A protein has these predicted regions:
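Contiguous domain-boundary segments centered on the initiation and propagation of an alpha-helix
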Residues: 295, 534-552, 556
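Structural alpha/beta core scaffold segments of enzyme domains
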Residues: 1, 14-501, 557, 594-600, ...
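Amphipathic, heptad-repeat alpha-helical segments used for oligomerization and assembly
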Residues: 219, 389, 570-583
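N-terminal amphipathic, basic-rich helices that act as targeting or association modules
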Residues: 1, 38-39, 247, 475, ...
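Short, exposed "boundary/linker" segments that immediately precede the start
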Residues: 4-13
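Generic long, charged, amphipathic alpha-helical segments
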Residues: 370-373, 552-576
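Conserved phosphate/anionic-ligand binding catalytic regions in large, soluble enzymes, centered on
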Residues: 104, 108, 224, 350, ...
Length: 625
């Protein structure tokens, strides 16, 4: 059996466990509520569809060694599994990752085909290459979401939330892996940015005859935001309150230091100013004018009606187990710098971001900084790039390593220039005595001196490495406003505007942040309006290529309006939080809320995603009778 549509979501072959009451049942949970609003929400199964499918080039090396080129988000994690599967000494296996055509969480997994290709290469003593076809990728690569949520929200008549109760059914696919615990992340973020005094949450993961579920951009957090943001809109409708005002009434207050406990009790938020993000999004969207335009269309009975959707979110980045990252910085004899890091970029722009960090601290031009990553022979350890963790962990490791190099260089320069280390400052191409530019030692000279100088108290080499430990997760947040236009005669939905205000702490490079926002929003919109992995009555996949799987292109999407607020975290020296998944978390509920807002005049309360033309048209026809 399999999850395929809203009629069959309770059918499954095997439950992995009894429902887990992680938040113990609360006796009389809704006793003080005037109203209890109930909703059943489906987060349909979607595919990551990276531009580059999985593949490997396995190259035998002398002495029984092997080099494997793979498109991975976490080459060091794969390295350990790979060596174990091959029965090799890890020192004899080198895993390398070149430019990767997208990951989105799906390429954090280890593929069994890697073992087959490597074994073939060893047996033939020649390189072996394997690359998935698109159709193979659509059924073999782990997929995402696949949750059904049963949500109850208790409120006072004025819109104040009294309690939240959720039961989540998660489809893990055929083999229990990451998908079997993704509902835990949903639980962690269940109450979102709101003050919810009581929470009761339980979840169950089940096995189905389908492709396994794994991490997909957001991994459990978009599902949490979807549930709370949808039920809030339904509550606003029930109570006759504007969707913005019911949110504003229940937002957690601004806080600037860790200590704000999430309603789940599983997360300690670091910093947040949720109302500021909401206010900024409403201002940029001109919310009042949008409502006026909507009222005009409704009054005129226009065929094309406007819908306005709002969502406010908070998410967890660098989750537990992902706080530590390796970094090293080394100055070479020619004055150039190499930075080593255990993250593994696949489109995020780490070369630019991490070079900026080194350049800022050491005063070396960015074009003289080389980033070394994604190679287990050159970088001794690493946790990879996932969970929006890279800048706050890997970037901080590079930052601290750069500081270590600078401190060592100052001590060396002080001895060479016969000055106090406190008087040594950055100069043009090296270090100098403050106020005396003529007394300067170039970086190349410092490196050469450090290599074999034997100066008392300094180790040889101008290098510093560290395993940075962020100790806790950070919590980015934001607010999105979506505007859709629905043709009530055909059911066609067009996203005409999408405004996003995302807060990822202190921003290092605005252009890189914008890129992450745009990509994430596109994937979030795709889930709301287009994408859906489907199976036929016998469990055969019927969306196994891009002719059948409705992945939008730029032609279906507007130019997103992206902005930021900055609320730095205290958990790392950069003040940075993650940004890679924020777009998917904020956009999906905003777009779905916009669709339901447009359909509310027909009395339609809910509609499962994706809001395809067929579904919207059918809902309108049913409502019209």
């Amino acid at each position: 059996f399999f999850f395929n549509d809203t009629a069959t979501t309770e059918i499954y072959t095997l439950s992995l466990h009894d429902a887990l009451p992680i938040c113990a049942p609360v006796e009389g949970i809704f006793d003080d509520a005037d109203v209890v609003v109930k909703g059943r929400f489906v987060n349909q199964r979607v595919a990551g569809v990276p531009m580059e499918p999985n593949g490997i080039i396995a190259v035998p090396e002398p002495g029984g060694k092997l080099t494997a080129w793979i498109p991975s988000q976490a080459p060091h994690s794969v390295h350990g599994e790979f060596a174990g599967a091959l029965g090799m000494d890890p020192a004899d296996l080198r895993v390398r990752t070149a430019a990767v055509g997208g990951g989105f969480g799906s390429k954090a997994a280890f593929m069994v085909e890697f073992i087959i290709a490597a074994k073939a290469a060893q047996a033939l003593d020649r390189p072996v290459k394997w690359t998935e076809t698109r159709s193979e990728n659509m059924v073999a690569m782990v997929q995402g979401r696949a949750q059904v949520q049963f949500v109850e929200l208790g409120l006072k008549r004025d819109g104040t939330i009294t309690a939240l109760k959720e039961h989540v059914l998660g489809d893990a696919g055929a083999y229990p892996g990451t998908g079997s615990f993704l509902p835990f992340f949903t639980h962690t973020m269940a109450t979102g940015v709101y003050n919810i005094p009581k929470l009761e949450f339980d979840w169950k993961a089940v096995l189905t005859n389908t492709t396994s579920i794994g991490a997909y951009r957001g991994a459990g957090r978009p599902e949490a935001t979807q549930a709370i943001e949808r039920i809030l809109d339904m509550a606003a409708d029930e109570l006759g309150i504007d969707p913005v005002e019911i949110r504003r009434k229940n937002l957690l207050p601004k806080f600037e230091a860790p200590g704000m406990m999430a309603g789940s009790g599983l997360a300690m938020y670091d910093t947040g100013d949720y109302e500021a993000a909401l206010d900024a999004a409403l201002a940029h969207a001109d919310y009042t004018a949008l409502r006026a335009a909507q009222a005009e269309r409704r009054a005129s009975g226009a065929t094309k009606q406007l819908g306005i959707g709002v969502s406010v979110y908070v998410e967890i980045t660098a989750p537990a187990g992902m706080h530590v990252e390796y970094g090293a910085v080394e100055v070479l004899d020619d004055g150039s710098v190499k930075a080593y890091v255990g993250t593994s970029a696949h489109g995020q722009g780490h070369d630019t971001a991490f070079s900026m960090i080194v350049s800022e601290i050491l005063g070396v031009p960015m074009d003289k900084v080389t980033l070394v990553q994604s190679d287990t022979a050159l970088v001794p350890r690493g946790s990879g790039t996932m969970g929006s963790r890279s800048l706050q962990t890997g970037g901080s490791a590079v930052y601290r390593s750069s500081e270590g190099v600078l401190d060592k260089a100052k001590q060396l320069a002080a001895q060479l220039l016969e000055a106090s280390p406190d008087d040594i400052v950055l100069g043009d191409g090296g270090l100098q005595v403050a106020g005396v530019p003529a007394k300067l030692v170039a970086w190349g000279e410092l490196s050469a001196k450090a290599a074999g100088s034997g100066i008392e108290g300094l180790e040889a080499g101008l290098r510093h490495e560290i395993d940075f430990d962020g100790t806790q997760s950070s919590f980015p947040f934001g607010a999105h406003v979506a505007v859709v236009e629905i043709d009530t005669e055909t059911g066609r939905v067009e996203l005409v505007r999408h405004v996003a205000v995302d807060d990822c702490g202190r921003i290092l490079n605005p252009m890189l942040v914008r890129g992450q926002q745009h990509g994430g929003i596109a994937q979030g919109v795709a889930q709301a309006l287009y994408e859906w992995v489907q199976y036929d009555a016998d469990g055969n996949p019927i969306t196994a290529n891009l002719m059948d799987y409705a992945m939008p292109s730029a032609a279906e999407l507007p130019s997103f309006e992206t902005y930021n607020t900055e609320t730095p975290t205290h958990l790392n020296p950069l003040g940075a939080k993650g940004i890679g998944e924020s777009g998917t978390i904020g956009s999906t509920p905003a777009v779905q809320n916009a669709v339901l807002d447009a359909l509310s005049q027909f009395g339609i309360k809910n509609l499962d995603m994706p809001a395809s033309s067929q579904r919207v048209w059918a809902a309108i026809q049913e409502a019209r009778g």
